[in-house]
Structures are given as C-alpha cells and as structure tokens.
C-alpha cells in the first residue's frame, strides 16, 4: 500500500503569489493511484471537488471555519476574499480543512473525528505541562482535528494536523492524544497515523516513544505505522512538486510503502 501525506498550504506556492493550485496539487499526488492520501490545509470550498479531481473516496472535515475577524462567514465569501491575494490571506478568511482520500478498491466502513485542542484537554495539559499563560491562550486560537477511517479488513487510517506552536510540548500533546485515540479505534488491527505533526523528532519528546508505531522520518510531516511493515520514508524532491519556477506548497509530500 502506498500512503502519502501532504500539507497543501491552501493551494499556495513558494514563492507565494496571487493564484492557487489546489486542483493541480491534488491531481499531482494522486495521478499514480496511491492507496491513501492525507491532506492538511485544504481550502474548505475544495472538499466537494476532491473526489472528482482524484478519483478516490474522500472523507473531509472543516477544522477552522470561515470568519471575517471575530464574525462567522461562509465558505463562498471566504473563498472570494482569499482569492484577492491567496499568498497573503492564506486561511485568514476561509478557514481550513483536512481530508483522507482512499482508493476505490477499499470500502470505508466508519468515519471518526477528534478535536485535538478541546477546552478540557487544553486546561488539563496546560496545567500538567506548566505552560505559560500566553501559550495556553494561543493554543485555543484555531481548532485542530484528527480524522480517521476504518476500512474493510479492519485497518484504521488517521490524519492529524497539530497546532503550530513555539512551545513543542503543545503539538506533542496533540500527537500523543491522536496516537492514543487511533490505537483505541484500531484495537488489535493495524493502523496508520499520518499528517502534519508540526514538530520534528529533534524537538519532540513523544514521537519516538509512541506505543508500537514505526519510527518517524525527518521534518514535521510523518507517517507512522503499527501492526504492519513500513518501508523507508520517501520525501519528494523539489523537482517532483515544481510547476515552472514555483514550488507547490511549502511542504513536500511524504510517502511510505506499507505491507
């Protein structure tokens, strides 16, 4: 099984510009029919398009809803405002979503969602970790979630997008929570935990000690496997995601072959 994860950066490029390439990114990373693809930072309006662009089953969920300042907005208005300058506004108006794409050769039996930075969890972990007040307040700024699907045969695949915080214990806490949740869903069956962990192994005190999971690779984008054999990390070279003089996203896709 080919498993990939990619933070789409809202369809933006490096360097950022006034055009987005969400469709091009989705088609690029799914053109050779991988088994599973986990996306983070998907524009919410694009969720309805993913199935047509990829030819895969899709489970998507909006994590951060569209807003204009403190006021709620709509998906379409968020898109229109963001399209004025996507590289500048990013998710400021339209929010962001996550998605798991599954080959049509498999059947999704169940779908699950976990809010990683729920209020009770933040309060409890903030006290336990002794986090500064400003760090605790910032932790609540944007809802972060982990999605999971249960497939025919029992395999569970989870996709998380952890909080991007200066203090590495914040994403660590969310990663540990997502891992424990995934293990609980899977029971004795194999499971995969993929996504943008927003912390690398050099700063994390959690990633290398998750119960039963395979070793993480470099960077903040990871694919961890339990109960199956995982091949080496394949982090795409810049050339594989280049469009002219532009690099698609500020993250490279990561893939692992699972047997």
Predicted features and spans:
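Structured beta-strand-rich core segments of catalytic domains in phosphoester-bond hydrolases
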Residues: 36, 42-153, 237-238
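Soluble or luminal CAZymes and related metallo-dependent hydrolases
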Residues: 17-24, 42, 93, 139-143, ...
């Amino acid at each position: 099984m080919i498993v990939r994860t990619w933070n789409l950066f809202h369809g933006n490029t490096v360097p950022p510009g006034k055009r987005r390439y969400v469709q091009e990114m989705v088609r690029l990373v799914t053109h050779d029919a991988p088994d599973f693809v986990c996306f983070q930072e998907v524009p919410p309006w694009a969720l309805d398009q993913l199935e047509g662009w990829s030819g895969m089953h899709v489970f998507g969920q909006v994590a951060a809803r569209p807003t204009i300042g403190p006021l709620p907005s709509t998906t379409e208005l968020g898109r229109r405002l963001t399209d004025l300058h996507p590289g500048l506004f990013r998710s400021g108006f339209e929010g962001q979503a996550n998605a798991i794409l599954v080959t049509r050769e498999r059947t999704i039996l169940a779908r699950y969602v976990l809010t990683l930075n729920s209020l009770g969890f933040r309060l409890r972990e903030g006290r336990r970790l002794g986090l500064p007040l400003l760090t605790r307040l910032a932790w609540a700024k944007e809802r972060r979630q982990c999605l999971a699907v249960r497939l025919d045969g029992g395999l569970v695949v989870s996709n998380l997008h952890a909080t991007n915080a200066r203090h590495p214990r914040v994403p660590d806490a969310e990663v540990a929570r997502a891992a424990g949740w995934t293990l609980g869903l899977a029971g004795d069956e194999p499971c995969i935990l993929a996504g943008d962990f927003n912390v690398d192994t050099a700063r994390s005190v959690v990633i290398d000690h998750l119960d039963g999971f395979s070793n993480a690779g470099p960077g903040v984008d990871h694919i961890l496997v339990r109960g199956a054999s995982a091949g080496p990390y394949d982090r795409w070279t810049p050339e594989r995601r280049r469009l002219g003089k532009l690099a698609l996203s500020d993250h490279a896709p990561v893939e692992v072959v699972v047997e």
